[in-house]
């Protein structure tokens, strides 16, 4: 892989780490907790500077980072130790990392979404010739809201529900003329690719939503919600045995994926990072 792409992947990954640890740092300082060190990276130090009571360091391995608070890992008698502040403050400090990831993720998503001139919606605009789904009862204008029980916020939720299903048929819940309707037992045509892998022919088309300020905000929010849902369902699938560990991407795989995506453009690269943020 091109070294530049690897570096871009590492940079994006570190932005996520910095935002996460900064959330812990800024809330800890707000509540008067003593922060001994704020580190970017892991392993031996290659650079450090002392500012006030906190040592800021950069470490040799560009993966991870930490915010070392007094009394975080062991009991301390210091009145400014993490273990000595009120429980509700500890909860806020601990939750601040994930909160910052959500905020930064939303900003990244907003930047990516804003590049599009229009957005693919979850509303059916038409069908392929001899469409099975149309014969089963789906209609143009139907807004897809569930597939096999999975909530649909964006088109990628439809893809996820279909690709990860262990059933041969699909139950759709749609909003039609303002009312919710169910269309059950849709069996898409099975296809076999040149490499021998099997696939399903999804025979309906989705419409588009025009870009304006409100739709950009809405699409960014829905994309974040969709990402959270897919992440949760993926981990749930791993726990229940539906998915294997090999299907989950760790930090190293994430950098490789981001690097590969970068060669296809900024939009794909940022989305790769965002989808691994939570």
Regions found by a protein language model. Give the residues of each.
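Internal alpha-helical transmembrane segments
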Residues: 37, 56-57, 61-126
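Residue-level signature of catalytic and energy-coupling elements of molecular machines
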Residues: 20, 58, 97, 158, ...
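PDZ-domain C-terminal substructure recognizer with occasional recognition of PDZ-binding tails
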Residues: 139, 145-146, 157-205
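Functional transmembrane alpha-helices
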Residues: 85, 128, 187-278
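Residue-level signature of transmembrane alpha-helical entry/exit and packing/kink sites
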Residues: 1, 5, 9, 86-94, ...
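Small-residue-rich helix-interface/hinge motifs
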Residues: 4-77, 278
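Conserved PDZ fold ligand-binding element
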Residues: 133-155, 224
